[in-house]
Amino acid sequence: MAELTISANDIQSAIEEYVGSFTSDTSREEVGTVVDAGDGIAHVEGLPSVMTQELLEFPGGVLGVALNLDEHSVGAVILGNSENIEEGQQVKRTGEVLSVPVGDAFLGRVINPLGQPIDGRGDIKAETRRALELQAPSVVQRQSVKEPLQTGIKAIDAMTPIGRGQRQLIIGDRKTGKTAVCVDTILNQRQNWETGDPKKQVRCVYVAVGQKGTTIASVRRALEEGGAMDYTTIVAAPASDSAGFKWLAPYTGSAVAQHWMYDGKHVLIVFDDLTKQAEAYRAISLLLRRPPGREAYPGDVFYLHSRLLERCAKLSDELGGGSLTGLPIIETKANDISAYIPTNVISITDGQCFLETDLFNQGVRPAINVGVSVSRVGGAAQIKAIKEVAGSLRLDLSQYRELEAFAAFASDLDATSKAQLDRGARLVELLKQPQYQPMPVEEQVISIFLGTGGHLDSVPVEDVRRFETELLDHIRASEENLLSTIRDTQKLTEETEEALTKVINHFKKGFASSTGESVVPDEHVEAMDEEDLGKESVKVKKPAPQKKK
């Protein structure tokens, strides 16, 4: 039988190998205990080194955010289902602040405020992650707004223009078409996207906060049918989500958009709507026992929106020249724009489009109130062609509204007032636009030129929209060079204006009104003097005097 021999060296090497490969499963981590939980809020004892807005891990993989850092406990907002969180459960620190995955893979997808896909189309491979709470670009990192962002809506592009990097508030009562205005703006970016030019392309982010699930689905369907989901990301926090998700959703959308902005690209973000975010934040703050202020909102509700909207900017050329344009939506009650949240957001943004219930019910859609709507910086970004034709549009409409109220009581109006009323009625009709049908800027120029140039004065009010539609169809079919000239030069030169007037006058000859009458204006005839009215004039032909013989 062979003798088994083990040397001391073998034993030593085996022990060294075992010790070298040994790993300890123990780790040092802070663990807290749930003291109480309910209504999407949990109070946790322990965790002395936790950071503000740090992610906490609850049992079952549920995440929370540390908001209140008290002396002996932490107030956390639970992100997700909080029904299974009970007193006495352990809570772990993650050591990470809130962040979301970002990148081009998110285009065409629907995600929740944690960046997780919820459209059933599989996982998303992100390029990198971005923190939700980031400092907005400083004054030095910005430049003035100078490039237009066309909405495709005549009333906005002509009178309250929006530039890339601007924040334009869309404000109004419920059911006045606020979402439709923003969806139209997203749809209007398709033409730029199809050019493939990075300087023209605009990526879009639609943030739905507290909306019904059916509303979000209908918006997504409208974007898909319009071919806009190719360049759009939807961040959804529907009404069924917890208050924590509704509070975070706008910051998630901003993080996704800022990634592209700092990459030198142009982005449009829609917050629909910030009123519901403020209400969710109010609920969180009251449950965390923070002292309430005006309308029971916490003292930092202004900062909630200002730090969000200040991220919209036009970056300097040194940082790539990217831009982030914001369209926040605020819902008012009974057209009261002097309430707390509306006045806050009006003071933060660079202008507002005020949508009015009365105008909407009268059939004026989009129901934009010209008198209250304003754009503080977009005028510098407006193209020259629009600026030339729309120069008098706001004044004409304002005078029309004043005269309209006066004419309701006055029976006898002078000729000038009647002419202003007639022109104003046609302009109002001209600015009406169907939903989900944005108009290219060159066609807007022609449309507004019709109204401000007086070419519609002889067209009956009920035929104005049909005249506009048929004229644009005619120009697309046989005068395409006119559209391309305006599109390329972005100006309305004298030659183009003459050619356009010639086309309009020629088209009028073949256009019949709904009553069958011609819309060609009668030739101008000089009026008789007042003293000559009612007098008969008789021409007597006198024979020529005969010469004396």
UniProtKB/Swiss-Prot annotation:
ATP binds at G172, D173, R174, K175, T176, G177, K178, T179. Residues 540-549 have a biased composition (Basic residues). Its EC number is 7.1.2.2. Pfam families: ATP-synt_ab (PF00006), ATP-synt_ab_C (PF00306), ATP-synt_ab_N (PF02874). InterPro entries: ATP_synth_asu-like_sf, ATP_synth_asu_C, ATP_synth_asu_C_sf, ATP_synth_F1_a_nt-bd_dom, ATP_synth_F1_asu, ATPase_a/bsu_AS, ATPase_F1/V1/A1_a/bsu_N, ATPase_F1/V1/A1_a/bsu_N_sf. It catalyses: ATP + H2O + 4 H(+)(in) = ADP + phosphate + 5 H(+)(out). One of its GO terms (molecular function) is proton-transporting ATP synthase activity, rotational mechanism. It is a peripheral membrane protein. Keywords: ATP synthesis, ATP-binding, Cell membrane, CF(1), Hydrogen ion transport, Ion transport, Membrane, Nucleotide-binding, Translocase, Transport. The record marks S373 as: Required for activity. Its main location: membrane. Gene3D superfamilies: 2.40.30.20, ATP synthase alpha/beta chain, C-terminal domain, P-loop containing nucleotide triphosphate hydrolases. GO terms for cellular component: plasma membrane; proton-transporting ATP synthase complex. It is found in: Cell membrane. Residues 513-549 are annotated as: Disordered. Belongs to the ATPase alpha/beta chains family. Produces ATP from ADP in the presence of a proton gradient across the membrane. The alpha chain is a regulatory subunit. F-type ATPases have 2 components, CF(1) - the catalytic core - and CF(0) - the membrane proton channel. CF(1) has five subunits: alpha(3), beta(3), gamma(1), delta(1), epsilon(1). CF(0) has three main subunits: a(1), b(2) and c(9-12). The alpha and beta chains form an alternating ring which encloses part of the gamma chain. CF(1) is attached to CF(0) by a central stalk formed by the gamma and epsilon chains, while a peripheral stalk is formed by the delta and b chains. NCBIfam families: atpA, PRK13343.1. This is ATP synthase subunit alpha. It comes from Mycobacterium ulcerans (strain Agy99).
